[in-house]
Structures are given as structure tokens and as C-alpha cells.
């Protein structure tokens, strides 16, 4: 310490203190900027990962339901083939056999592409998959169960494509 000039010592201390040393101030500023940039990079990476996951999910959904329009348009064909089989009776004939084979092949292709048939006779009425067109009093079936199907319903990969039109048993 300089006893002749005590003010010099305090001046030296002030110049070298971390609050006033320009290099230390700049280093702290740069450290703050680096931390901010690192946080930005992490946010951008997370956003990019979220976009990638959304894109994968969207592509998967598009693949899963790409045939929805086509299969939906084939439902009346299934209905017609089914009605034709019912009308032809149970007597074997080449025409009936051909119709049945065509129906089974077409249905297999549709099922392989995610279609599921809803033929709920005897099942409990499910408003998510069935549309009740009437109720009938019956003694041998529990109330709330489907007793007749007017039109079969269909699901595509667990999504309702068309509800089954049904008659439901009601209480006496």
C-alpha cells in the first residue's frame, strides 16, 4: 500500500474490481448470450422433433384412411350382393355360387384393407355403432339387445363408416 497516496490504492481496487473490469463485464455478457443461444437451440430442436412426430402421425392417418372413400362407395355393392344371396334362397345353383364367391372375395379384400362388418344380432345396442329404427316387444330376448338388422354397418380401422340399422328389443 502506498501510504503517501492512499487514494491510489482505492483507485487501483476500483479499476480491478469485477464490476468495472471491462473484460469481465464482456465475458459475463457473452456467457449470457451463449446461454440464451443454447436455450433457443434446444427450443428449436424440440419444435423440430414435434413437427417430425406430427408429420409421421399425419402420414400414418392418411395411410390408414386412404381407402375410406372407395370402401364407402362399395357399401351399396355389398348390400346388393347380400340381398341377392338372401333372395336366391339356400338352394345351390351356379348363379348363387358365383354370387356368393364374388361377395366373399370382395369382402375379403375390403377386410384386408381395414373394413370391419357390423352384424349385431343378439348384441347389446351400442349407439356408437348402431342406429335403432324401431323397438319391438319380445319375450325371449333381453331388453336393449338387437333382434334384427335391416342394414349391416361397417367400421374402417375402428372408425364408423356406416352404422347398422337395427330393431331393438324393448321391455314388455
Swiss-Prot record:
Q: Name one GO biological process term.
A: protein folding
Q: Per the record, what is one GO cellular component?
A: cytosol
Would the keyword Nucleotide-binding be found if you checked this record's keyword annotation? no
Location within or outside the cell:
Cytoplasm
Q: Which Pfam families match?
A: GrpE
Superkingdom to which the source organism belongs: Bacteria
Q: Which parts of the sequence are annotated with region: Disordered?
A: 1-23
Alphabetically sorted, this entry's keywords are: Chaperone, Cytoplasm, Stress response
Q: Does the keyword Transmembrane helix apply?
A: no
Indicate where this protein is primarily found: cytoplasm
CDD domains documented for this protein: GrpE
Output the Gene Ontology terms for molecular function.
adenyl-nucleotide exchange factor activity; protein homodimerization activity; protein-folding chaperone binding; unfolded protein binding
How this chain assembles, per its entry, is:
Homodimer.
Assigned protein family = Belongs to the GrpE family.
Q: What does this protein do?
A: Participates actively in the response to hyperosmotic and heat shock by preventing the aggregation of stress-denatured proteins, in association with DnaK and GrpE. It is the nucleotide exchange factor for DnaK and may function as a thermosensor. Unfolded proteins bind initially to DnaJ; upon interaction with the DnaJ-bound protein, DnaK hydrolyzes its bound ATP, resulting in the formation of a stable complex. GrpE releases ADP from DnaK; ATP binding to DnaK triggers the release of the substrate protein, thus completing the reaction cycle.
Q: What is this protein called?
A: Protein GrpE
The organism that produces this protein has a lineage beginning with: Bacteria, Pseudomonadati, Pseudomonadota, Gammaproteobacteria, Lysobacterales
Amino acid at each position: 500500500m502506498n501510504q503517501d497516496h492512499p487514494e491510489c490504492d482505492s483507485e487501483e481496487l476500483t479499476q480491478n474490481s469485477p464490476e468495472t473490469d471491462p473484460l469481465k463485464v464482456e465475458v459475463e455478457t457473452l456467457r449470457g448470450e451463449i446461454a440464451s443461444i443454447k436455450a433457443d437451440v434446444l427450443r428449436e430442436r424440440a419444435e423440430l422433433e414435434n413437427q417430425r412426430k406430427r408429420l409421421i402421425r399425419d402420414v400414418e392417418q392418411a395411410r390408414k384412411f386412404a381407402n375410406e372413400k372407395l370402401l364407402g362407395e362399395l357399401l351399396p355393392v355389398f348390400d346388393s350382393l347380400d340381398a341377392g344371396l338372401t333372395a336366391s334362397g339356400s338352394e345351390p345353383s351356379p348363379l348363387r355360387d358365383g354370387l356368393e364367391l364374388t361377395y366373399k372375395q370382395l369382402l375379403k379384400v375390403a377386410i384386408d384393407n381395414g373394413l370391419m362388418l357390423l352384424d349385431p344380432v343378439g348384441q347389446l345396442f351400442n349407439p356408437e355403432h348402431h342406429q335403432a329404427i324401431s323397438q319391438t316387444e319380445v319375450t325371449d330376448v333381453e331388453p336393449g339387445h338387437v333382434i334384427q338388422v335391416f342394414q349391416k354397418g361397417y367400421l374402417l380401422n375402428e372408425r364408423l363408416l356406416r352404422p347398422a340399422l337395427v330393431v331393438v328389443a324393448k321391455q314388455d
